[in-house]
Structures are given as structure tokens and as C-alpha cells.
Design a protein with these regions (language model features):
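Ser/Thr-centric signal marking residues that sit
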Residues: 266
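DNA major-groove recognition helix of helix-turn-helix
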Residues: 210, 222, 261-263, 274
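Hydrophobic alpha-helical segments, especially transmembrane helices
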Residues: 204-205, 224
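Alpha-helical bundle regulatory/interaction domains
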Residues: 1-203, 213-218, 232-253, 269-287
């Protein structure tokens, strides 16, 4: 096993699985936040993926998984090969009744634009079969991975594929890259007007660049980062949460604002969410 691969295992009443994280090629560091492979079986039926401020390339190397559209009527959409999940402003419910073997590439907020070269607001809040956007090349990548048993070699194969697809003429504007980094560094607490002033653009022009190259407005991305910051603090506590202090620390107007944002991004109040099983920082068990 190379020093680029780190594997974690989990076993508890909610299931058993392993997650391997790959240290990404430096040439991809501007666009890729992480690469990972998860495999195992859960004891629960359904989970909810929470907004993260990242988009995902997901390659299914195991049994079918399902995205659940709430309806009514409720619809289970199967995913069996390769798909792309854009930046989301709400939760996604999923099921993996037969276990999973999933390789993922998490893109930074501005990381997909140099790779797909499309308007990102056309892909936000959407999940698409990648073959619909890229043709059969996405499916041939999956076939190569299925025929490559070593995990390290699988990650290297995906890296080569990503590097080959980079579009030199599709470059993220430096102001967008800087603003995305500032939003992340401040936990979403920097005012959009300050971002515009410091980039030298009007708020409208910066917003248009964000819609094109990120897929969300600066304000929407900042809301996700504020939520993630509050969620991290909630996870690190001992169950006795001073809600008003948490709201102030994370940049919310008051406790009511915090609760409303949690309901928007998770479907639960903070207190309800804290009582639920959490397989990882990105999801919550529904049933």
C-alpha cells in the first residue's frame, strides 16, 4: 500500500464499511478536494446526504444504489454506473439495500468548470448520468476500473482520465477562485458586498461569474459554509448545545435563523438532527 492511500474502517450497530482516501495528484489540487472509495453494508434502509459545498463524480463499482425523490408519489431512481451530482442547496435521500462499492471524486466549488467546461448553474441542484454529458467515455472509465482490482491503480486511472479531460481554455476567473477561498476561510461569514469590493467587481458581475463557473451565487455558497460550520460544532459537542451561542458564533442573526437554515439544508431542526445516527459528516440516517 502506498503512502498516498489512507483507509478507515467502521463497525457498529448501523453497519460495517471501509473508506479509503487518496492523496490527489498535485496537478489536480485546484479542482479536486478529495478522492475516496467506500465499500460495505449498512444496517439502515435510507440515509440523507447533506449539502457540502462540493460537487461529486460518483462511479458505482458494486450493486445498484438508489436516489429517492420524495414525491408524492415517492420514486426510487437507480444508479448503476457513473453520475455527476452538482452543487446542492438541499438534501438528497439515498438507499443502498445490497451494500455499496463506490468511488468518488469530490470537486471544490469551482473545480468542475475546468473539467466539464459548461455553465455550472445548468448543473446545480441536479444529478445526471455522466454519459449524457460526456458520452461513452464515462462508461469506458468504469469498465477499466472494474477490470483493475488494485485500489491504488484505480485511483491513478481516474487521475489520468481527469487530467486528460482538463480544458486549458476553460479557466476559472482568479476573482472567483479567490472569493470561493474567502467564503470557505471565513465559514461563510464574509458579506457578499465585501467580496465584490475586494475583487473590484460590482456585486452583480461577481454573481454572474459565480453562476457561470460555480453554479451558485456567492450568498448561496456562503449559506452552505455557515451551515457546515454549525454542523461541525454540533458534532463536536457533548449533547448540551447552547443554541443561541452557536448561532452567534456561526454568523446567524439569532437562534431562529439557525433553526430555519438547518431545516432548509437537512429537513430537521438542529435538536432533531443531533439525536439521529450520523454515519459520517456528510449524511444522517433516516430509517
Amino acid at each position: 500500500m502506498t503512502n498516498r492511500l489512507l483507509t478507515f474502517t467502521h463497525q457498529s450497530p448501523i453497519g460495517h464499511w471501509s473508506v479509503s482516501v487518496w492523496k490527489t495528484d498535485p496537478r489536480l489540487s485546484e479542482m479536486v478536494a478529495s478522492m475516496w472509495f467506500g465499500e460495505g453494508k449498512t444496517a439502515y434502509q435510507r440515509d440523507r446526504i447533506l449539502p457540502s459545498g462540493q460537487s461529486q463524480l460518483l462511479i458505482n463499482l458494486g450493486p445498484p444504489q438508489y436516489r429517492v425523490e420524495p414525491g408524492p408519489p415517492e420514486v426510487r431512481v437507480p444508479f448503476v454506473d457513473v453520475w455527476y451530482s452538482g452543487l446542492h442547496q438541499g438534501p438528497i435521500d439515498t438507499e443502498a439495500p445490497h451494500g455499496n462499492a463506490l468511488l468518488g471524486v469530490a470537486f471544490s466549488a469551482h473545480g468542475t468548470f475546468p473539467w466539464l467546461g459548461e455553465r455550472m448553474d445548468d448543473l446545480s441542484d441536479r444529478i445526471i448520468a455522466l454519459a449524457d454529458a460526456l458520452g461513452d467515455g464515462a462508461l469506458s472509465l468504469r469498465e477499466r476500473l472494474l477490470n483493475t482490482p488494485a485500489l491504488e491503480a484505480r485511483f491513478e486511472c481516474v487521475e489520468r482520465w481527469l487530467l486528460a479531460r482538463l480544458k486549458p481554455r476553460t479557466i476559472v476567473h482568479p476573482a472567483v477562485r479567490w472569493a470561493v477561498d474567502r467564503i470557505a476561510a471565513t465559514g461563510g461569514r464574509i458579506p457578499v458586498e465585501d467580496l465584490a469590493t475586494q475583487t473590484g467587481f460590482t456585486r452583480k458581475h461577481l454573481g454572474n461569474l459565480f453562476q457561470q463557473q460555480v453554479g451558485l451565487s456567492p450568498k448561496s455558497l456562503a449559506r452552505i459554509h455557515r451551515f457546515r460550520g454549525a454542523l461541525a460544532l454540533l458534532n463536536s459537542g457533548d449533547g448540551q448545545v447552547p443554541w443561541a451561542a452557536l448561532a452567534e458564533q456561526c454568523g446567524y442573526y439569532d437562534q431562529s435563523h439557525l433553526i430555519n437554515e438547518f431545516r432548509r439544508f437537512t429537513g430537521f431542526s438542529p435538536a432533531d438532527l443531533a439525536r439521529r445516527d450520523r454515519p459520517d459528516s456528510q449524511s444522517v440516517v433516516l430509517r
